[in-house]
Amino acid sequence: MPSITTAKREYEERLVDCLTKYSCVLFVGMDNVRSQQVHDVGRALRAKAEFMMGKKTLQGKIVEKRAQAKDASPEAKHFNDQCEEYNLLSGNTGLIFTNNAVQEITSVLDAHRVKRAARVGAISPCDVIVAAGSTGMEPTQTSFFQALNIATKIAKGMVEIVTEKKVLSVGDKVDNSTATLLQKLNISPFYYQVNVLSVWDRGVLFTREDLMMTEDMVEKMLMEGLSNVAAMALGAGIPTSSTIGPMLVDAFKNLLAVSVATSYEFEEHNGKELREAAINGLLAGSCSAAAEPAAAAPAAPSAAAKEEPEESDEDDFGMGGLF
């Protein structure tokens, strides 16, 4: 049987070899995961990754020693800094090393998710709702429902839940009454699995929030950004590949409006036909709308000229009255 020192040395060599050989490290949570489940996950990952457990104090010392070596790479030093800053090597966690895509590893972990009953004292990872309907329980067992304030009635000799009831919320501690009722209803509400907490990939640390982002979310953010940039460029009059089309259309509309207002006709691009259509109100869009105030502008001086004699007569009449 190897000594403790030899075992630690072999563990250190394996951990350093994995940190050097693989570009991606997944920090995974192991809460409520049983040994058989861990064994099954390790066997499924055998061709894709290496799964390592161990004392976090020992792992931290090995990572720190690797970063303080004379020939330590900048990435090794940065990895140690990130582990210390975010306290990655702590709690009931494991390490998965791989060069494959993270999605391949998470798909294996999801495939080994196990359904479990709610045990007394366990922390609920999800909301648990008891659905309405017949329970198949005899009327003598209504006390279990009364303890949780669940409205029931007797129908066809069986206890029936009137309305659905939430018995657990995320973070709640399972008490004896809730655990007993869920067991009698044959409800196993919890799912446990090796859960990815964070990922170190080629010198970049991705947190749990980063990992929750999907390709659709990233695509939506990029499209919104491109739309905002295009709107700013269009408003500022800066031609780009996405704004040159609308800018040319707006410029042509302005030319057509000027043509309508000044009686100038241009033959290019069906200018004469479009001008006649705008004058006759047959052209939809802002061209005819822009042409209306321009065409109405010359009529304003003539209207003012007609009003001038009336104003002058009133002025003369008023002056004559004074003298």
From Swiss-Prot:
SS bond list: none
Sorted UniProt keywords: Phosphoprotein, Ribonucleoprotein, Ribosomal protein
GO molecular function: large ribosomal subunit rRNA binding; structural constituent of ribosome
Protein modification: Phosphorylated.
Superkingdom of the organism of origin: Eukaryota
PANTHER family: 60S ACIDIC RIBOSOMAL PROTEIN P0, LARGE RIBOSOMAL SUBUNIT PROTEIN UL10
Oligomer status and interactors: P0 forms a pentameric complex by interaction with dimers of P1 and P2.
Record field: compositional bias (Acidic residues): 308-317
Function: Ribosomal protein P0 is the functional equivalent of E.coli protein L10.
SUPFAM superfamilies: Ribosomal protein L10-like (SSF160369)
Family: Belongs to the universal ribosomal protein uL10 family.
The protein, known as: Large ribosomal subunit protein uL10
Record Pfam families: Ribosomal_60s, Ribosomal_L10, RL10P_insert
Gene behind this protein: LIPO-A
GO biological process, one term: cytoplasmic translation
GO cellular component: cytosolic large ribosomal subunit
Region feature (Disordered): 296-323
InterPro entries: Ribosomal_protein_uL10 (IPR050323), Ribosomal_uL10 (IPR001790), Ribosomal_uL10-like_insert (IPR040637), Ribosomal_uL10-like_insert_sf (IPR043164), Ribosomal_uL10-like_sf (IPR043141), uL10_eukaryotes (IPR030670)
